[in-house]
């Protein structure tokens, strides 16, 4: 129950940080940072699963998910590569470190979360 409550709090807080383009920034709590697609896809996946499991309110989260998914597929090129994927990152308390990270189009750790989303959408 405690884990589910933490999950709901996280999903609720993500609502406040969704950027105008529909996705989330490299620093989630700063909408001025560049859009990061792999993390955004993970958030979409978590929201879709939450709605389908009955943990999240569909009327609240479906519009966010729809906006994010439409934005996310706009980052997939003709070869199926996804842009805006942050290179592998260790953790630090230095915000600038995260802002200076490079993006790697086609990076496989960006592909997987998008495939998770597709799978979640297709599940009944």
Model-derived regions, located:
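Long, well-ordered core segments of solenoidal/helical folds
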Residues: 4-23, 64-81
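CBM-like carbohydrate-recognition segments
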Residues: 34-35, 39-124
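Short linear capping/connector segments at secondary-structure termini
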Residues: 23-31
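A surface/extracellular/periplasmic glyco- and lipid-processing/surface-interacting theme
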Residues: 1
């Amino acid at each position: 129950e405690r884990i589910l409550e933490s999950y709901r709090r996280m999903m609720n807080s993500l609502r406040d940080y969704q950027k105008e383009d529909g996705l989330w920034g490299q620093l989630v709590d700063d909408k001025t940072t560049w859009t990061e697609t792999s993390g955004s896809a993970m958030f979409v996946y978590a929201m879709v699963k939450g709605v389908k499991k009955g943990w999240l309110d569909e009327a609240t989260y479906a519009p966010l998910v729809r906006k994010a998914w439409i934005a996310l597929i706009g980052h997939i090129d003709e070869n199926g590569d996804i842009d805006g994927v942050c290179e592998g990152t260790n953790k630090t308390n230095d915000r600038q470190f995260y802002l200076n990270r490079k993006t790697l189009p086609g990076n496989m750790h960006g592909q997987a979360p998008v495939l998770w989303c597709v799978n979640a959408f297709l599940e009944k």
